[in-house]
Design a protein with these regions (language model features):
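Extended ligand-binding clefts on enzyme/binding-domain cores
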Residues: 61, 97-101, 108, 120, ...
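Aromatic-rich carbohydrate-recognition surfaces in CAZymes
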Residues: 57-85, 89-191, 409-425
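Active-site-adjacent bridging/hinge elements
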Residues: 36-46, 110-118, 203-215, 336, ...
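Extended, well-ordered alpha-helical scaffold segments
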Residues: 28, 32, 79-95, 152-172, ...
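Long, acidic, intrinsically disordered low-complexity segments
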Residues: 1-26, 80, 166-189, 314, ...
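Well-ordered alpha-helical scaffold segments within catalytic/enzyme domains
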Residues: 7-21, 66-79, 138-153, 231-251, ...
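Low-complexity, Ser/Thr/Pro/Gly-enriched N-terminal "stalk/linker" regions
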Residues: 1-62
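C-terminal capping/lid segments that line or modulate ligand- or cofactor-binding pockets
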Residues: 118-124, 129-132, 296-316, 354-426
Length: 426
């Protein structure tokens, strides 16, 4: 059993009571919330937890964290659910040690995935080996939040310590990608699915930040320093320091020292290279930079994103540079901002033209203090579910019945998180 049905049912009833003015929200919330627990979570023989992303038979390190994060509220009172989340952290750390460059994994060593098309150092556990900085941030975030929200510490075992060392080592190596063993080439006509320069990636200069091959959308980076992911790395490196200092885990002294150094160098890189100006001359964060003077003004609808910087804990919502960046992102100056008959928001090179992502709409709501904006976005999300009663990867701004991904648990859970935020359940 992954959770106590009685405890979760009682909690859902409490949420429904607080949201009784919004029955449409409640209907979608309950469907999304229970679907993830009932249909994506599997407890394995070793007691760890595998979380299916949805309609793709694999687990993403990023998605699985976001899928279970909204359950931390209930995990405070449900020991079964608490162990399910701890089991996910254990599984994530085990898989990171199988290959820290992989973004998604199989439930067993079955060689399923992109093995016939991808030229990179694969093994049977890997579904896909697109290296994304945030894939290593998310498990650290979940381990920390589970501890702080519920007091659970069983996730901090020997595997966690070893995996944390591996993450710190990899991020240090990738501060100068010339020292990296990672290469990725896919047999494809879609340029976003492969790396240039025989799999090495685009040209860059050393900045102090850590290099990324792909974005959270699983599309390749145009420039190799992805600012939102480096922001996220700064945040979780702070978590690492708190975990190892307060719990006095094995090798605490060296891990704390390494994480402090890395955090300071990445933050300095952000301060020295991450800023650009928008069309109004305002100082904003670039989405990607290469250290050679090139920068992109855009955002990705996934998380981490520039829009999500306060949600990730990197900056305050009222930070001036963030607010200028936010206005720029949510405007036509962002080439992936689309406005239509039913909605406006962020799209992606990963999906069709004029398709926007519910995840980004949820993040827009989670990064404003304006209750009216939150309500507007929740109403919009429910109205644009394509008549399915759940969220999708993306939908057309002029016709929400046109959408991608029939079953996308991450989007479902981001909607749930925004509902809880609106109701002040944090």
């Amino acid at each position: 059993m992954t959770y106590s049905k009685e405890i979760v049912r009682e909690w859902l009833d409490q949420v429904a009571e607080r949201a009784k003015e919004y029955p449409e929200w409640v209907d979608v919330f309950e469907r999304c919330y229970t679907d993830t627990l009932d249909n994506t979570v599997e407890i394995l023989e070793d007691g760890s937890t595998f979380v299916l992303t949805g309609d793709i038979p694999a687990m993403w390190l990023r998605d699985s964290t976001a899928q279970l994060r909204p359950y931390l509220h209930v995990a405070k009172r449900d020991p079964q659910l608490r162990q399910t989340i701890a089991g996910l952290v254990k599984r994530q750390m085990t898989l990171i040690l199988k290959d820290p460059y992989a973004n998604s994994f199989n439930i067993e060593e079955n060689w399923k995935g992109h093995h016939e098309t991808d030229h990179t150092d694969l093994n049977g556990w890997i579904w896909e080996r697109k290296y994304e900085v945030d894939s290593l941030c998310y498990p650290l975030q979940l381990a920390y939040l589970l501890w702080k929200e519920t007091g659970e510490t069983s996730q901090f075992d020997e595997t966690f310590v070893t995996a944390t060392k591996e993450i710190l080592h990899l991020w240090t190596v990738e501060q100068d990608h010339k020292n990296s063993p990672y290469r990725f080439v896919r047999d494809t006509d879609r340029k976003e699915d492969t790396l240039v320069n025989d799999g090495f990636g685009p040209d860059f200069a050393v900045t102090g930040m850590t290099w990324s091959a792909f974005r959270p959308s699983d599309d390749c980076c145009q420039y190799s320093y992805l600012i939102p992911s480096n922001m996220f790395a700064v945040v979780v490196l702070g978590y690492v320091q708190k975990i190892f200092a307060e719990l006095n885990l094995a090798d605490s002294e060296s891990i704390i020292a390494d994480s402090k150094r890395l955090q300071a160098e990445i933050q300095e890189g952000i301060e020295n290279y991450a800023y650009t100006t928008n069309s109004k001359g305002e100082k904003i964060y670039a989405f990607e930079v290469d250290g050679l003077g090139n920068a992109s003004i855009m955002d990705d609808p996934n998380v981490p994103s520039l829009l999500a910087a306060p949600y990730l804990g990197y900056c305050a919502i009222d930070d001036e540079v963030y607010q200028a960046t936010r206005r720029t992102i949510l405007s036509p100056e962002n080439p992936y901002f689309y406005e239509g008959k039913y909605a406006s928001g962020l799209g992606s090179s990963h999906t069709f033209y004029r398709y926007i992502w519910p995840i980004a709409l949820s993040i827009q709501g989670l990064t404003t203090t304006d209750k009216a904006e939150k309500k507007f976005l929740l109403d919009q999300l429910v109205a644009c579910d394509g008549g399915t009663g759940v969220m999708h990867e993306s939908f057309h701004v002029d016709d929400p019945t046109k959408y991608s991904r029939e079953w996308f648990s991450w989007a479902n859970m981001m909607f749930c998180e925004l509902v809880l935020d609106y109701l002040d359940i944090r």
